[in-house]
């Protein structure tokens, strides 16, 4: 089992804001959640995925836990979110609005399939 860490603070950062992504190393928090869901307008979702992936690939000194909040699995954006960010190995994926165990199981299946491809 993975070691559990106490998160005293979690900072939410919109995935479409390059200036905020660049400043993540400066924030004095335990964890960062980069949001690809509600914080990102529909017209900017594709660009936000690219920004988030590039940030994750370039952020080598991971002294903070980095989570990515994807769009809900019932949207047209969720699979693209996963395909974009999983290769950059975020510390975790946050699933919004999971209203049933089946939704969580579906995400588990998708993540397992991705891990098997590695």
Residue ranges and their predicted role:
Residues 1-118:
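Expand to "…catalyze enediolate/carbanion chemistry for C-C bond making/breaking, isomerization
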């Amino acid at each position: 089992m993975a070691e559990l860490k106490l998160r005293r603070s979690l900072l939410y950062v919109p995935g479409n804001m390059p200036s905020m992504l660049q400043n993540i190393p400066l924030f004095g928090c335990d964890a960062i959640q980069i949001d690809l869901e509600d914080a990102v307008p529909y017209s900017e979702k594709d660009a936000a995925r690219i920004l988030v992936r590039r940030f994750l690939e370039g952020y080598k000194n991971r002294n903070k836990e980095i989570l990515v909040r994807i769009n809900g699995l019932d949207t047209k954006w969720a699979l693209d979110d996963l395909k974009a960010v999983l290769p950059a190995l975020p510390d975790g994926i946050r699933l919004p609005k999971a209203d049933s165990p089946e939704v969580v199981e579906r995400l588990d299946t998708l993540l397992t399939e991705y891990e098997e491809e590695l």
